[in-house]
Swiss-Prot record:
Coiled-coil residue spans: none
Name of the molecule in the record: Periplasmic trehalase
Sequence segments annotated as region (Disordered): 544-570
Alphabetical keyword list: Glycosidase, Hydrolase, Periplasm, Signal
Record lineage: Bacteria, Pseudomonadati, Pseudomonadota, Gammaproteobacteria, Enterobacterales
Gene3D superfamilies cross-referenced by the UniProt entry: 1.50.10.10
Entry's EC annotation: 3.2.1.28
GO MF assignments: alpha,alpha-trehalase activity
Residues bound to substrate: 159, 166-167, 203, 212-214, 284-286, 317, 518
Gene behind this protein: treA
SUPFAM superfamilies: Six-hairpin glycosidases (SSF48208)
Main location: periplasm
Length: 570
């Protein structure tokens, strides 16, 4: 049951729709594919729909340095009344749009800057951050874009004032390391609640994120909780795991070879794989002006097509990267929806394997066998279609040109991470990553310098963890150590200088936060905190844990993966 505070009145939805009918015609390309309020009264609408032309005018006026500010603003009264006032006042002499916004909306508060106690080690600093980054939103203001959740949760930090899907798994690794299993359980419960409420886990708990998900790490979260609670966790969340899988596979039963539907594709040989997809094809409310400018820069493409590809890249977590573009220097050439990502399909393989394990734990052997069969079929499809034999690494498949892409990215490590790679191929991936992506400060996301944040020279904590654990899974301990040691050194040097952990790092050297992208570098930072704690355990023996990165590189990693390799690794 969805709490009443996140419902929208049918009458209000219809009133807004009728009141704005004439004005919204101007913005038809922005809202044409938004969900019809009358068709689903359970789904709250994002601010660009609730506020129509007012939202567009405020964002285009660039009243705030960050477009996310107004997307997160809370109307002080019924949006219908605010819109009526706006229509009456906007053409009057002396009308001040900023004053109108200040009177009618509560803007998000800037978070207080956290000043850590002097002399803290890296571990002490991270442990002290957990309560600082913890939020509770059981109740939210009416018309708020924030979606309530039943339990407390940890946010990434900075401008990210809400929970994010894939970020949270890496944050939870750190929470578990800090023995905050109660917080791990709370966050898994929140995601299970979202699956029950919306049919999927949205990008984040905002109304404007409901049209897409993110990399599907829920299975990993449940497996993590099962390390503490045993198979009871698997049995408890089996229904939500099944619903998550149904979301990603929706429409597969009607697909013919060569067809796609939302997040699922069927290749010409009948292989079934997945892609990222956003249900809307409008500018993102949190990046409204930027998306409109991107679409205008390429008049040869329909704006709605560009908007959906931008949104789908946000769903991938890699927003943005040359990985999704025809021209790495031109964002408007993005075509995320025509690319089958290797990392997404590795994660869905893991979801299928977890479903098999959870079904077996629940005593349903027949269903477990069915999920195992689906996982085996996906593994074969990954090996057949997402392996670049010429280059010697896993890569994405190009639906537009019906061929494997040549670009090497850190996503190539995901089949190793989920134990879905053949052993000889894993060795080739390790060699390629070491030769082309490994830098003094860690693993680069790609080797392309596009100015986008998911490209060189940036390295991101979750990709360092995926690489290190994936390489360990296949006995590539030397390369795993290099990734771990170099990234930790980068984190430590940056912390020594700035007394903070950041969202991303420049891995071309050590001690510098990353750049590029749509917003300034953010600190906090949830997934960096989690990965740092786990990596500290990798380089320090269990009998002598370290609170900071040692000055001397250890000879070998002290921990080994706990996951059982699949048949492909034997």
């Amino acid at each position: 049951m969805i709490p009443p505070e996140i419902r929208r009145s049918v009458l209000l939805q219809k009133a807004i729709k009728l009141a704005l009918a004439g004005t919204l015609l101007t913005f038809a390309s922005f809202s044409a594919t938004a969900a019809d309020p009358s068709s689903d009264t359970e789904t709250p609408q994002p601010p660009d729909i609730l506020l129509g032309p007012l939202f567009n005018d405020v964002q285009n006026a660039k009243l705030f340095p960050d477009q996310k500010t107004f997307a997160d603003a809370i109307p002080n009264s019924d949006p219908l009344m605010i819109l009526a006032d706006y229509r009456m006042q906007r053409n009057q002499s002396g009308f001040d749009l900023r004053h109108f916004v200040d009177v009618n909306f509560t803007l998000p508060k800037a978070g207080e800057k956290y000043v850590p106690p002097a002399g803290q080690s890296l571990r002490e600093h991270i442990d002290g951050l957990w309560p600082v980054l913890t939020r509770s939103t059981k109740n939210v203001e009416k018309w708020d874009s924030l979606l309530p959740l039943p339990e407390s949760y940890v946010v990434p930090g900075g401008r990210f004032r809400e929970i994010y899907y894939w970020d949270s798994y890496f944050t939870m690794l750190g929470l578990a390391e800090s023995e905050h299993w109660d917080k791990v359980a709370d966050m898994v419960a929140n995601f299970g609640y979202e699956i029950d409420a919306w049919g999927h886990i949205p990008n984040g708990n905002r109304t404007y994120y409901l049209s897409r998900s993110q990399p599907p790490f829920f299975a990993f979260m449940v497996e993590l909780l099962a390390q503490h609670e045993g198979d009871d966790a698997l049995k408890e969340y089996l229904p939500q795991l099944q619903k998550e899988y149904a979301y990603w596979m929706e429409g597969v039963e009607t697909l013919q070879p060569g067809q796609q539907n939302q997040r699922v594709v069927k290749l010409e040989d009948g292989s079934v794989l997945n892609r990222y997809w956003d249900d809307r094809d409008t500018p993102r409310p949190e990046s409204w002006v930027e998306d409109i400018a991107t679409a205008k820069s390429n008049p040869n493409r329909p704006a709605t097509e560009i908007y959906r590809d931008l949104r789908s890249a946000a769903a991938s977590g890699w927003d943005f990267s040359s990985r999704w573009m025809d021209n790495p220097q031109q964002l408007s050439t993005i075509r995320t929806t025509t690319i089958v990502p290797v990392d997404l399909n590795a994660l869905l393989y893991q979801l299928e394997k977890t479903l098999a394990r959870a079904s077996a734990a629940a005593g349903d052997r027949a269903e477990a066998s069915q999920y195992d069969a689906l996982a085996n079929a996906r593994q074969k499809a990954i090996e057949m279609h997402l392996w670049n034999n010429k280059e010697g690494w896993y890569a994405d498949y190009d639906l537009k040109n019906n061929k494997i892409r040549d670009q090497l990215t850190a996503a190539a490590l995901f089949p190793l991470y989920v134990n879905a790679a053949a052993k000889d191929r894993a060795a080739k991936v390790a060699a390629a990553a070491q030769a082309h992506l490994l830098q003094p400060g860690g693993l680069a996301t790609t080797s392309v310098k596009s100015g986008q944040q998911w490209d060189a020279p940036n390295g991101w904590a979750p990709l360092q963890w995926v690489a290190a654990e994936g390489l360990q899974n296949y006995g590539q301990d030397d390369v795993a150590m290099e990734v771990t040691w170099r990234f930790l050194t980068n984190v430590q040097h940056t912390y020594d200088r700035e007394k903070k952990l950041v969202e991303k790092y420049d891995v071309s050297s050590t001690g510098t936060g990353g750049g590029g992208g749509e917003y300034p570098l953010q600190d906090g930072f949830g997934w960096t905190n989690g990965v740092t704690l786990k990596m500290l355990d990798l380089i320090c023996p269990q009998e002598k844990p370290c609170d900071s990165v040692p000055s001397t590189r250890p000879a070998s990693l002290s921990a080994t993966p706990t996951k059982t390799p699949s048949a492909a690794t034997q």
